From Swiss-Prot:
It catalyses: S-ubiquitinyl-[E2 ubiquitin-conjugating enzyme]-L-cysteine + [acceptor protein]-L-lysine = [E2 ubiquitin-conjugating enzyme]-L-cysteine + N(6)-ubiquitinyl-[acceptor protein]-L-lysine. PROSITE patterns: ZF_RING_2. This is RING-H2 finger protein ATL22. GO terms for biological process: protein ubiquitination. One of its GO terms (molecular function) is zinc ion binding. It comes from Arabidopsis thaliana.
Amino acid sequence: MTSKLLPLLLNLIFLFFFPLLNASEQKPCYSFSCSQESVVARFPFSLFSYQPESCGYSGFNLICKDDANTTLKLPKSEPFLVKEIDYETQRIRLNDPENCLARRLLNFDPSGSPFSFLRSRNYTFLICPKEANITASFRAIDCLGNTTSSFFVVQFENLGSMPSSCHIFKILPLPFSWFVAYTTYPDGQNSRDMWLKWDSPDCRDCERRTNSRCGFKNNTSHQVECFSSVNPGLHNTGLQVLKIMCLSLVGPLTALTFCVGLVMCSSERVSSQIQQAVVARLSGSVTSQPSNEVARIGLDESTIESYKKVELGESRRLPTGSNDVVCPICLSEYATKETVRCLPECEHCFHTECIDAWLKLHSSCPVCRSNPSPLRD
């Protein structure tokens, strides 16, 4: 019975300490970039294959394309090229890998993502024949159209000057920043880009501090905290101390458990050997008595069998209500499902094999020396 305590103690150590060690371990979240020219990815963004998923917020997953360009995949669109990330104002500048952002905007829907337009207005896309007389307020979209027709974009309120040969293709709410850049600087660097913003998680105050970065408090929470280290999660002193303490305790406790288990197993084996030796000696003494002995000192088999015999349950409580846990003859603990026999009158109980061997040699209780009477039905 006692040998079963060893694996139980070991299981308790593993179940308690190892989840605690895992929960206390905060993986480092270094900044990464796909190349020297690409944007730097850090919280709330995480760079797939280069940073642990726990380093980024849900919906802020970046991927390296061709080992040089950084892309962002939104739920309802194909990946965008990431040209710039402003962590202090929480804005991101996106581009189309095919250099035709206008085509992407015709079906663009940022819902379902953490991003939204900085400002949006309704704009109208027109299709006009090549020979149409177009005013300066209409901006051509060179990457759309074909040999016979062209696409133009115009603010909704300027539709009054639309030539009769043109027709409306689509009216869409689009980022105002894209249209201003497109119409003001049609050949400039930002003319094909789109700015989006995110509001959650809000790390703007933290980003404005010197050498401060946002990050998760721990691996099991979505709460954000401002760290003084440039690598949030690396210098969480409390968690590191807890981890060291746990590691310091696991080794000694495991060794102590093994030692206790060995002592318990050895004690159990010794008790078992004593019990077997007592039974063997008593049994041998009985069989060695001369067959022609006239007067038997012990009790006969029928009298012994008349005394109460009970199989112990999980509580190992004796049927007499006694709190004894050790057999007085062999001095080993009672175990579940072991059989005990109790003597009448004095109500002392023993292992069945122990007391049976004793009573074959002696007619008195080995504890109180009283002579039990045979029970009659």
